[in-house]
């Protein structure tokens, strides 16, 4: 059972961010789970080789909170750094999630439950999105 503190933190992390996503169609990457949760990533590479990430997600509170935490954690970082972090989480190469980042500590509850898929969908989606990313003809400063 989740504590009230955990519930409040999940609700805070899951606040809906509205983004208007307007880029070339090959820069939008949508993933959907069996239960109907969906996430769409927009990836833009800046001139310094770092990536600006935006996402639009619809689904359960665990997915929304996980997506927001991941976006804050990976925004404005290099591709290799993002892929390394995401791969660690997907492969469970940690004793506790707070080893990776303190902001992920709240998700330790879900790593061995049936909600693990909800937690991992943004990570798998971002990994697939970055691996299939094709740079635009121009980059943004």
Curated annotation (Swiss-Prot):
InterPro entries: NIF_FeS_clus_asmbl_NifU_N (IPR002871)
GO biological process: iron-sulfur cluster assembly
Highest taxon of the lineage: Bacteria
Signal peptide interval: none
One of the record's GO molecular function terms: iron-sulfur cluster binding
Protein name, per record: Uncharacterized protein BB_0085
């Amino acid at each position: 059972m989740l504590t009230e503190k955990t519930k409040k933190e999940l609700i805070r992390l899951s606040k809906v961010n509205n983004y208007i996503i307007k880029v070339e169609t090959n820069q939008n990457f949508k993933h959907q789970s069996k239960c109907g949760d969906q996430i769409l990533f927009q990836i833009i590479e800046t001139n310094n080789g770092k990536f600006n990430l935006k996402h639009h997600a619809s689904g359960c509170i665990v997915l929304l909170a996980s997506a927001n935490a991941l976006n804050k954690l990976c925004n404005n970082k290099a591709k290799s750094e993002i892929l390394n972090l995401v791969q660690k989480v997907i492969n469970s190469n940690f004793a506790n999630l707070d080893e990776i980042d303190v902001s992920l500590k709240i998700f330790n509850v879900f790593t061995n439950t049936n909600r693990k898929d909800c937690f991992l969908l943004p990570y798998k989606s971002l990994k697939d999105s970055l691996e299939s990313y094709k740079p635009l003809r121009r980059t943004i400063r």
